[in-house]
Amino acid sequence: MEAQVENAIQIAFDPTSSQQLRGQAVEFLERLRSEGSAWQASLALFTRDPRPSDIIRHTSLDLVNNAVQEHRLDEQSLAYIKDTLMSHVRQSYAPGSSTADTSHIQNKLMQTMTYLFAALYPTSWRSFFDDFRALAGDQATIGNVNTATTFLYLRMLVQVHDEIADQLVARSKEETDRNTHLKDLIRDNDIQKIALSWQEILAKWRETDLSLVEMCLRTIGRYVSWIRLELVINQDMITTFLEMAGQQGISDPESPAGKVRDAAIDTFSEIVGKKMEPSNKIELILFLNLPDVVGQLITSPALAEFNSPNYDNDLAETVAKLVNNIVFDVVKILENDNVDEQTRQRADDLIRIFTPYLLRFFADQYDEVCSTVIPSLTDLLTFLRKLQKKQGTVPPQYAAVLPPVLDAIIAKMKYDETADWGEEGEQTDEAEFQDLRRRLHVLQQTITTIDESYYIETLSRLVNGTFSGLSQGDQSLNWRDLELALYEMYLFGELAIRNQGLFAKREPSSVAAQHLVGMMNSMIDSGLANYPHPAVQLQYMEICVRYYQFFEQNPHLIPKVLENFVQLTHSSHVKVRSRSWYLFQRLVKHLRAQLGNVSYDIIQAVADLLTIKAELPDTSEDEMSSDEEDQSADALFNSQLYLFEAVGCIASSNTVSAENKKLYAQTIMSPLFVDLEQTLPQARNGDDRATLQIHHIIMALGTLARGYSDWVPSNNSSAVPHSDVADEFVKASEAILVALESLNSSSSIRHAARFAFSRMIAVLGSRLLQQLPSWIEGLLSLSSSMDEISTFLKVLGQVVFTFKSEISNILDTVMTPVLQRIFSALATTPSGTDDEIQLAELRREYLNFLIVVLNQGLGSVLVSNTNQSSFETIISSIENFARDTHDAPTARLAIFVLIRMINVWCGPDKVGPGANQTPTSPATTQAPLPGFENYVVERFSPLAWSIPASPGFNSKDAQAKQVLVEAANLQTEIVKKVGEPYVERLKSDLSGNGVAADGVDQYVRTLAGALEGTKKEKEWRNFFVQFVDRMLSGRG
């Protein structure tokens, strides 16, 4: 067996073995693992002399591990494994032995020993710790003579802790109970001896292997969370910790001495982090003399020499962690209302001592160090906020904390002196800095809630002071100072325009708003817009857009700010240029009513940017680039579209005459028409770049249309665009249709045309209807995908809604072609998940389109002479969807369509509160459809039974229940509109299904009650769901 196991391991890990042979070997080893039967052979392999290779020993020990942990071996077998492995350890790790295991074999061995410990320590191996301690030697030899066995001893201690006390590992209740019992046994029997061994190792730390010292400290750090602190907190141990933590002159933080120093400080952190009573925690911090310890560490050369090669950021992060833990605990004590006065006073004293330390690390040049103390600074500020809310003010001893904290936050908000904004390869650093800024902003917001007036005063001083310095030519200012002022000014808006706009009745709406207005004036006066750094330029534009209301109240400043924006739209910096196009559109959209006589000048100033030059995508471009960093040709064109929308907004301003609106439209679109005409022949011949150029032109025309009109399709037609302007966009629509007809097989052209069509609605008004058949023919071609048809149906529904009073005749003409294209797509068999999703979406959009037609009083189109041939297909498709058990949302929607048809075509209610009343809504004022009541009884009423009878229908499923609720609503609508004939049909159906006479009466009575009000209607729905459930259960 031994040879078989060894051979299998060799084959499994030999890369030269054939795949088939390796597969067989792996399968054999997995079988041994699952059976747990090869542990004897594996144990023998591991301990064999001469030793096999490490991979064989490691895998063999893993098989032993598996048997110990998973197969519940009897105690005799476990004892045999224990004795065999301990014998191996004694031989291999004896002083002077040259056969010690490699590091990864040691770790595996200690894992096995830990599993054996968990199984045997409570019963038959109480000497577990003593056995390993004996290997490490007595007080004289532990650590500095028997180094290998001391390492092994500490490894064992670490493994035991990780197995039974690691809080980060999720465990079952059974494991938790076992671990609690084991920890109790260790605390009762061995922990004092273990603590003594730590003391013995550390007592001679200066002459001991420093890696061993570090490991000992890390081990103590693990154990302090669940042992009595007095075992490690005594004067000798604390003196040793302080000696290690206070080492000076360490040039390399990664050296053994540096690691020991950091481990000692981490041990302090773990000790401080131990849960205990508030008074005991304060006593502990003072006993450890941590105020002086931290103070000395901060003034040591390794932390005092900022911006020098000697600065040790690893040490800074380690001490910051200690400070963070101390402040966290002290704040928790201060928040505790049950703390005695002496403890509270001591905690107050500690906060005063540690706040400067906290701010020292918060302001550290390294963001990693700063981030380490943000949690405790957050806790401190949260405590002050609660105190302010509770007492109405912050006590003086705490109020003094706020100024240095806010100053430190603002300082950390500033770009580092070494930062190179926008440079290649800086994206990761930039992302990390912005993440830090977001965290700092949260702290700043907390300070605002504690002392709003101080925050306003501080930020105003910073921003106005910076802009004043710029105005006066202060040479010490750089882009980082200006960007910080603008960034803080941007954030300031959260307070200044929190509850309302910047102005109320032409006056600043709050004190903060008043200060923000002052900042805006300072910014404008400083000439900051001309500062050449891209980060400043971007923030300037963001500020102008965010606070556009300032310009509404100061219209004399609008020409200048627009001039600045126009300059920035021509920036040579690609990020500034592309972002400015978007922000320019945002600004002019807000200010279009105040543009006045400058409209033409602005359009002329950006006209050179409206030239479209399509570029085929470069396959080497990084497809994973973020939207902000994307500088591809496609991304730049998408930004360019904002310019077209912007000039549309400018050209259609209320301050522009109708004559000029038409002129501007001609000026902007004429070059596009010429380009389209010249490029179309090349695109017809299959030129990909020409096709992309046509796509871009169509998108630009659609986007211009969106900018050109404020009109939102609704029942109000008062804002329909001026006819002269509409004439120009009719030409645009015709040009797009020519391109669409020529390039109909191109999905990108269809996409662009669909995009433009939906945006032409607002500028063409009802003129669009004359072209609707051509649009439908182009956009619902045989090449169109299901996704395209779904999207177009949404737009067509919008057209129907918008022009319901004028569209009837045209809709009657186009309905059958539209339905035929839909039916053709619905009949497609999906070939994958994406197709299934698109098909489900198409079904829903088709049903929604029918609902729009019915709701807008256009139901007669569906049954007209022109479209009557499609009516049966419509009804059949709806019935099929209603019975589809795999798509409950669509099934519910399908039933709802049937309910709308009944409501529209069956005339007035026959029974219920609305019986014989004259209908008033557009949907129900349509003429009843002769004979439709009988059709409903024959065709729709059976669905109540055929839906739950459909294969796969599960009445217990939540979504299926919702379908049944809709089926109940269908029956309510039928009985309301048809009356007695339907009731008789129901009785017949129920009796035919084996329902007793009293059951039939109850069913009919409950259904009739649904017409009496909301409560009864709900009772009927619940009754029907339960009725179907009982019926299906009976059949089962």
From Swiss-Prot:
Pfam families: Exportin-T, Xpo1. Its main location: nucleus. Keywords: Cytoplasm, Nucleus, RNA-binding, Transport, tRNA processing, tRNA-binding. One of its GO terms (cellular component) is nuclear matrix. Gene3D superfamilies: Leucine-rich Repeat Variant. GO terms for molecular function: small GTPase binding; tRNA binding. The lineage of its organism: Eukaryota, Fungi, Dikarya, Ascomycota, Pezizomycotina. This is Exportin-T. InterPro entries: ARM-like, ARM-type_fold, Exportin-1/Importin-b-like, Exportin-T_C, XPOT. It is found in: Nucleus; Cytoplasm. One of its GO terms (biological process) is tRNA re-export from nucleus. Belongs to the exportin family. It comes from the Eukaryota. SUPFAM superfamilies: ARM repeat. The gene is LOS1. tRNA nucleus export receptor which facilitates tRNA translocation across the nuclear pore complex. Involved in pre-tRNA splicing, probably by affecting the interaction of pre-tRNA with splicing endonuclease. It comes from Phaeosphaeria nodorum (strain SN15 / ATCC MYA-4574 / FGSC 10173).
